[in-house]
Structures are given as structure tokens and as C-alpha cells.
Amino acid sequence: MTDKNPQMERISQVFGADEIPRVAGKTLHIYFEYLKERLDCPCLLTGIESIRFFGWEERFEFGYGSQAEYERLRRQEGSYKDKYELKEFDATVDEEWDILVKVQRIPYRKRFEIPLSQLQAVDKSSGNYQLLNDYTVWYVNWR
């Protein structure tokens, strides 16, 4: 095995291989099972940035639209700035998209199904933070 940084080592170990495989249906299922066994739930999550699922927010970040419109859409759509509770790892593997997790927004209690690669654990010192960060790094860089 070549010298890898610790994160690359952890990702390789998910698949039991020297080389990190590309994101595909089979590898998404492998990662899903890995996370299902290791994530501690409930877990408090938040979005990473205003792209993909949270892409509606991008224009507001650049100064377009009113604050009232932003707040209205935020209640309806969910924001990457919101906090979400993952009560259990109730997820679906969408081979074309991502691992989709069912979360409940705090405080409004609205439920969403959000791509896991768009979320991170709020507690950066937790094992969940590392697990989810490793998944996102793999998902973004091996697609």
C-alpha cells in the first residue's frame, strides 16, 4: 500500500482495498452498510454549503432577493445553515444520486430527505463528524 494520509487510509478500509474505488451503485451500498453499523444516532447535522440540495440559497448569498423571501423559502426548503436531527440511520441508496437520509429540522420539525454528502455533524469532535466527512470526501472526489 502506498503512503496515504490518515483519511485516505480510513476510506480505503471501508472497502477493504488498497485503492479507493469510484462512486457507483455497488460502492454506495458498501459505504451505506459501513455507516449504518458505525454512526451514532441520534445525531445533530447541518448543511455543508449552498449547492445541490441547498442550491436555492446561493442567490441570496450574493445579495439577490429580499430577507423576507429568503426566510419564507428557508421554512419551506430547508437551509444549509439549519440544524437537522438524524434520529436513526433511515436511508435510501439512490445509485444515481447519493445516500439519502431522512432528517427532521430543528426547531420547525419539518422532515426532509437530504443527500448525505451535503451534511456534516455539528459536533466536530465526534466520531460521526469524521465518518461523515470521510464519506463526503470520497463522494465528491471519486465520482
Short names for language-model regions:
Residues 1-54, 61-131, 142:
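Basic/aromatic-rich interaction segments and small domains that mediate binding to polyanionic partners
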